[in-house]
Design a protein with these regions (language model features):
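Non-catalytic, structured segments within soluble enzyme domains
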Residues: 1-44, 189, 199-203, 218
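Glycine-rich, acidic and aromatic/proline-enriched surface loops and short helix-turn segments
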Residues: 18-25, 74-89, 119-123, 151, ...
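Short coil/turn segments at secondary-structure boundaries
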Residues: 32-38, 66-70, 171-173, 181-185, ...
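A penicillin-recognizing enzyme superfamily signal
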Residues: 43-64, 72-74, 85, 91-100, ...
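Short active-site loop at a secondary-structure junction
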Residues: 68-69, 92-113, 121, 125-131
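Conserved catalytic neighborhood of penicillin-recognizing serine enzymes
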Residues: 123-179, 226, 238-267
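Mid-domain, small-residue-enriched loop/turn segments at the edges of structured enzyme/sensor domains
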Residues: 141-147, 175-215, 231
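Proline/serine/threonine-rich low-complexity "mucin-like" segments in extracytoplasmic/periplasmic regions
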Residues: 361-430
Length: 430
C-alpha cells in the first residue's frame, strides 16, 4: 500500500492532492479524518487544462534547471474553481508547491491594484503624469526601466509602459493605505509577506503565491466581484455528501472600476509589455512583473472566463532566493519572457474549447480595441533554445517594466516552508 501511495504522489499529482488536503483542513476536517480516509472528493481540476499546464512548463525549455521554481495557477473567474496547477515536476523530490505555497516578489503585477485605488479616487486613464526619470519621490530615488524619461504622459501610457515614477507618485497621492487595501480586497491575503502601506508597494515588494495572484486578477475579470479560489467541488463520506461548491461572490470593486482596470490591462497586452499574450487569439488582459536583482519574474493575465498566474523564482541549495540571470543560457529573465510565453502556451490549449468573449464595459473607456491585434495561435511562436533567449540587457531601475529589456525591483525571499510527509488518504477526482 505504501508503495502504491508513493507512486500515486509521484510527478505533478502529489501537488494537486496536497492542495486538496490543505483545503479540507481549512474546511474543518482533521488530519485524523484524512488519515482514516473513506472520502470521495470531486475536484475542480480540468483534465485538459492540467495537461496543458504541465506541457507548457515542460515546453519552456527551462523546467529542469537546477534551483528553478516555476509555478502556475489557473482559475475560473466566476466561480474560483482552480482548473489547473503546476506545483513542480515531482512531488516526491520536493514537497513545496510552487503554485500555492512558494512565494515570489510580485514586481509590477501589483500596479493594477494601484490603478483601482486611483480610479476610486477620481483619477482616470487620460490624466497626465510626470514620467521623467530619475525622480525623487517621497524620499525614494526612482528610475524607470532603462532610465527612460517619458516626460508628461497619460496614466494609460504609463500603464502600458509600466512607468515606475508615475505609479509611485500616484500611489503616494492616492494614499498608500488605499493601494494596500485595494490589493487585499482583490484577494491578496492581508498577511502576505511584504504587503505594507508604502509607496514602493506598487512596485511589488509583496510576495504572494500564484494562487493568490490568479484569484486577485480574477476579481477584475469578474467585474469587481471576488470569489475565493477552490480546488474542491464536492466532498462525500459514507455515501453522504458533506460539502458542495456554492461560490459566494463578494463585491470588492464597483463594476465601473473593474471595467476600467480591464481596459487598461487589455492595452498592456495589445500595446505594451504583455504583447506575447496576443498569441492566444482572443481578448486578454494582463500585467508583467520583474523584481530587483532579477529574483522573480511574473505574468498574470486573464480572459473574461479564466485567470492564470505564472511565476519563476530561483533558489540556492540552502533555499535562499537568487537571481534568475542566466536561466536558459540567456541574460536577465523578465515577465515578458518565459512567464508570458508559458502563460500563452497554456491558455491557448486550456481555453481551446471555450467561446471567445469580449470584456464587458470596455466601450465606456473609448475601447476601439481592434481585436484583430490578437494573433492566430497557430502562427504564434514561443521562445526556442537558443535563438529566442531572454535579453541580457538590464538597468538599475527599482521596478522592472516586465519587458525583455527590463531590470526588476524590490527585495524579498521567494522561499516558503514545507512540512509533513506525503499522504494519500484522499484521492482527488480530476
Amino acid at each position: 500500500k505504501a508503495k502504491s501511495a508513493k507512486n500515486y504522489l509521484a510527478g505533478t499529482n502529489g501537488y494537486l492532492l496536497e492542495s486538496v488536503q490543505r483545503e479540507m483542513v481549512r474546511r474543518g476536517y482533521s488530519e485524523d479524518d484524512l488519515n482514516v480516509g473513506g472520502f470521495r472528493i470531486v475536484t475542480t481540476f480540468d483534465k485538459n487544462a492540467q495537461a496543458a499546464a504541465v506541457e507548457s512548463v515542460k515546453s519552456s525549455g527551462v523546467s529542469d534547471e537546477k534551483g528553478l521554481r516555476i509555478g502556475l495557477t489557473s482559475v475560473k473567474t466566476d466561480t474560483g474553481e482552480v482548473i489547473a496547477m503546476y506545483g513542480g515536476a515531482d512531488y516526491l523530490k520536493n514537497q513545496l508547491s510552487n503554485a500555492d505555497q512558494a512565494v515570489g516578489l510580485a514586481g509590477s503585477t501589483f500596479k493594477p491594484f494601484a490603478l483601482a485605488a486611483a480610479f476610486e479616487d477620481g483619477i482616470d486613464l487620460s490624466s497626465t503624469w510626470d514620467g521623467s526619470s530619475p525622480r525623487t519621490i517621497r524620499g525614494y530615488k526612482l528610475k524607470n526601466e532603462g532610465n527612460v524619461s517619458y516626460g508628461n504622459i497619460s496614466l494609460l501610457t504609463a500603464t502600458e509602459k509600466s512607468v515606475n515614477t508615475v505609479f509611485v507618485d500616484m500611489a503616494g497621492k492616492v494614499g498608500v493605505d488605499k493601494v494596500k487595501d485595494s490589493a487585499i480586497r482583490a484577494g491578496v491575503p492581508a498577511n502576505t509577506v511584504g504587503l505594507v502601506a508604502d509607496p514602493t508597494t506598487v512596485l511589488g515588494t509583496a510576495s504572494p503565491t500564484t494562487m493568490d495572484m490568479a484569484g486577485a486578477y480574477a476579481t477584475f475579470a469578474n467585474r469587481g466581484e471576488r470569489v475565493t479560489p477552490t480546488t474542491i467541488k464536492e466532498i462525500a463520506r459514507g455515501g453522504t455528501v458533506e460539502y458542495e461548491l456554492n461560490p459566494t461572490k463578494q463585491r470588492a470593486f464597483d463594476t465601473e472600476i473593474a471595467d476600467e482596470v480591464n481596459y487598461a490591462l487589455q492595452k498592456v497586452v495589445t500595446n505594451g509589455t504583455g504583447y506575447a499574450a496576443t498569441g492566444i487569439g482572443r481578448p486578454a488582459a494582463g500585467k508583467t512583473g520583474t523584481t530587483d536583482n532579477n529574483k522573480s519574474a511574473w505574468f498574470v493575465g486573464y480572459t473574461p472566463q479564466v485567470a492564470t498566474a505564472v511565476m519563476l523564482v530561483k533558489q540556492d541549495s540552502k533555499g535562499n532566493a537568487i537571481s534568475l540571470y542566466g536561466t536558459g543560457g540567456g541574460g536577465s529573465v523578465h515577465g515578458a519572457d518565459y512567464p508570458a510565453h508559458i502563460w500563452t502556451d497554456y491558455m491557448s490549449i486550456a481555453m481551446s474549447d471555450m467561446e471567445s468573449e469580449d470584456f464587458q464595459g470596455s466601450n465606456d473607456y473609448g475601447n476601439d480595441s481592434g481585436y484583430n491585434n490578437y494573433g492566430n495561435y497557430n502562427n504564434y511562436s514561443r521562445p526556442s533554445s537558443p535563438s529566442s533567449k531572454p535579453s541580457s540587457s538590464s538597468s538599475g531601475s527599482p521596478g522592472g517594466s516586465g519587458n525583455s529589456s527590463s531590470k526588476p525591483s524590490g527585495t524579498a525571499s521567494s522561499s516558503a516552508s514545507a512540512s509533513g510527509k506525503p499522504k494519500a488518504s484522499a484521492k482527488p477526482t480530476p
